[in-house]
Amino acid sequence: MREEELNRHADRLERAMNRVRESWNRERNPGKTRYLVSEALTTSQEINRAMMRGRLHPEVQKQWFIVRSELNRLAEAFEVPKVRW
């Protein structure tokens, strides 16, 4: 996966997480937020696959590890599948 593609996926993930935050802050509806979290995690799977396949700078991999860990905490909270290693 090229850097441009990875950046597009990162932008999609950022937008998805913004929707999660906005929905939760506005409505506090666990069902709707669970759905939005699930969508965000689906997007994050694309990034994760690229990170696992590609030879990326160690700092990029370290940052993704941190983000992925936080996403998985969110997945646990909303009882949706985690981003797999």
Which positions does each model-derived feature cover?
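Alpha-helical segments in soluble extracytoplasmic regions
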Residues: M1-S23
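Short, charged, amphipathic alpha-helical segments
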Residues: E3-D11, G31-L41, P58-R68
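Short, solvent-exposed, charged loop/turn and helix-capping segments
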Residues: R19-R34, A50-Q61
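C-terminal amphipathic alpha-helix
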Residues: T42-W85
